C-alpha cells in the first residue's frame, strides 16, 4: 500500500520548526511494507488543506495527518476531514474525562475550546494520547485509510508505536521491509557507484540506494519479504558482492559512526589517545568525548592554534615553523609525536591546515595534514586536499582523523 504524510501547520512553512515527524513516520511505515511516495506540508488554512486532501486521495491508499488537533481556531485538521468525509464530530468520553481531570488538578478553567480536543470522527478508531490531551484517530472509508495524529513529536511518536502501527498492520500484506546501511569513507560517491553500477542497475529485491553525506558515502540495502530471516539473507548476498569490490573503504553499519568505531577499537586494544588540534580547534576532541566511558582511553588534547603553543607547549622546533611552516608535514609529525609524549598516551594524533576562506603561508584553503604517532610504530602523516566551506573543511578533517586512526588500529 502507498501512503502520503500531510503535515499541517503554518509554523512548518515559515521554517519555525522542522518537520521531524515525517522522517520518523516514513521510516516506521517502510518497516511494515508501506511505501511513502509523498510528503506534503500545508498551512492552517481550510481551503488549502481540503485541496491537499483531494490530491492525496488521488495518489495514496493511506493518508496520515500530523498536527491541527489542538484547542485553537487554527487547529482545523479534524474539522476539515470531517467535512470531506461527510462525518460528524463527536466527543470521545475517555479523552473528555482525561482533559477535564487535567484542568481540575491544575485548578484552571475548563473552557469550551479545550473540550474541542476530545472531538473525534464518528465511528473512528480512537488512539489514546498517553503524553498529551488530543487523541488521534483512524478511519477506513471509501477504500482509503485516514490517520490523524497530534503534531508534537513527544505525543505523536509514542502514539504511533503503541496504537497506530498495530492498526495499520490490518491493512498490509504482512510483507516486512528490512534495511541495512553500509558506511564507507575514503571513496567518493561517483567512484563507489562505478564500482557497483551493475548491481544498482540490476536491483529488484533488495534495492540499493547510494547517499553521499559530508565526506562519507552510504549504501542502503532494502529487502522485502514476509519472513525477516529471508529478507536478511537477500541483503547479505548483495552486501557480500559489494564488499568484494569496495570493502577496503567500508567501516560500519547503520548508526555506527566513525568516531564510535574508532573509540570502540581503542578500548578493545587497551590503548590511550591524545590529540593536538590546530585547524580543527577542538572538534576532534569534542567528538571523542561524545562516546560514553571514553575517559578510559582518552588522555586529553591541546588546542595549539597559535605557533607559540606549537613551539613552547608541544615542542615543535622553531626552525620547522619558520622553514616548513605550521601547515606542513613536518609540523604535523612533531605535533603528533609530542602530544603523545606530553600527555603520556600510546597514540598521538594531530591536525594542521588551512580552513579558509583565505590562503595561509602561501597554501590554499583545504591544504591539510593529519599526523598519527603510535608507540613502537613509525609516525605517519596523511596529506589531504579538501574542498568546501571553512566549517566543512574542519569537520571533514576530523572525520579523516577518525578514519585513519580506525584503519591503523585495525592493523595492530
Curated annotation (Swiss-Prot):
One of the Pfam families matching this protein, by short name: MoCF_biosynth
Stated name of the protein: Putative competence-damage inducible protein
Family the entry assigns: Belongs to the CinA family.
Superkingdom as given in the UniProt entry: Bacteria
InterPro entries noted in UniProt: CinA (IPR050101), CinA-like_C (IPR036653), CinA_C (IPR008136), CinA_KH (IPR041424), Competence-induced_CinA (IPR008135), MoaB/Mog-like_dom_sf (IPR036425), MoaB/Mog_dom (IPR001453)
Organism from which the protein derives: Bacillus cereus (strain B4264)
Amino acid at each position: 500500500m502507498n501512503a502520503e504524510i500531510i503535515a499541517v501547520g503554518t509554523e512548518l512553512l515559515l521554517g519555525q520548526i522542522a518537520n521531524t515527524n515525517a522522517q520518523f513516520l516514513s521510516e516506521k511505515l517502510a518497516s511494515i511494507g508501506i511505501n511513502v511516495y509523498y510528503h506534503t506540508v500545508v498551512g492552517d488554512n481550510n481551503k488549502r488543506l481540503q485541496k491537499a486532501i483531494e490530491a492525496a486521495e488521488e495518489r495514496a491508499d493511506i493518508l496520515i495527518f500530523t498536527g491541527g488537533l489542538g484547542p485553537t481556531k487554527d487547529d482545523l485538521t479534524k474539522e476539515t476531514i470531517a467535512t470531506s468525509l461527510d462525518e460528524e464530530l463527536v466527543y470521545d468520553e475517555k479523552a473528555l474525562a482525561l482533559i477535564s481531570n487535567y484542568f481540575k488538578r491544575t485548578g484552571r478553567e475548563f473552557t469550551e475550546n479545550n473540550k474541542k480536543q476530545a472531538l473525534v470522527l464518528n465511528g473512528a478508531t480512537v488512539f489514546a494520547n498517553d503524553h498529551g490531551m488530543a487523541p488521534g484517530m483512524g478511519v477506513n472509508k471509501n477504500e482509503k485509510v485516514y490517520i490523524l495524529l497530534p503534531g508534537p513529536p513527544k505525543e505523536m511518536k509514542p502514539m504511533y508505536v503503541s496504537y497506530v502501527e498495530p492498526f495499520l498492520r490490518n491493512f498490509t500484506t504482512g510483507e516486512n521491509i528490512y534495511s541495512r546501511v553500509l558506511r564507507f569513507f575514503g571513496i567518493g560517491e561517483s567512484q563507489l557507484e562505478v564500482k557497483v553500477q551493475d548491481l544498482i542497475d540490476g536491483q529488484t529485491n533488495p534495492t540499493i540506494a547510494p547517499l553521499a553525506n559530508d565526506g562519507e558515502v552510504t549504501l542502503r540495502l532494502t529487502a522485502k519479504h514476509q519472513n525477516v530471516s529471508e529478507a536478511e539473507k537477500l541483503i547479505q548476498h548483495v552486501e557480500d558482492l559489494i564488499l568484494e569490490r569496495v570493502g577496503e573503504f567500508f567501516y560500519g553499519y547503520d548508526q555506527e559512526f566513525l568516531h564510535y568505531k574508532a573509540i570502540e577499537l581503542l578500548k578493545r586494544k587497551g590503548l590511550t589517545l591524545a590529540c593536538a588540534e590546530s585547524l580543527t580547534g577542538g572538534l576532534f576532541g569534542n567528538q571523542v568525548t561524545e562516546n560514553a566511558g571514553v575517559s578510559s582511553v582518552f588522555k586529553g588534547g591541546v588546542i595549539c592554534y597559535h605557533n607559540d603553543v606549537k613551539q613552547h607547549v608541544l615542542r615543535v622546533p622553531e626552525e620547522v615553523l619558520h622553514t616548513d611552516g605550521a601547515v606542513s608535514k613536518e609540523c604535523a609529525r612533531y605535533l603528533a609525536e609530542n602530544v603523545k609524549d606530553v600527555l603520556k598516551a600510546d597514540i598521538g594524533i594531530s591536525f594542521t591546515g588551512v580552513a579558509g576562506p583565505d590562503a595561509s603561508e602561501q597554501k590554499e584553503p583545504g591544504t591539510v595534514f593529519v599526523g598519527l604517532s603510535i608507540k613502537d610504530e613509525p609516525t605517519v602523516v596523511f596529506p589531504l586536499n579538501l574542498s568546501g566551506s571553512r566549517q566543512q573543511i574542519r569537520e571533514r578533517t576530523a572525520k579523516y582523523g577518525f578514519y585513519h586512526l580506525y584503519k591503523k588500529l585495525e592493523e595492530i
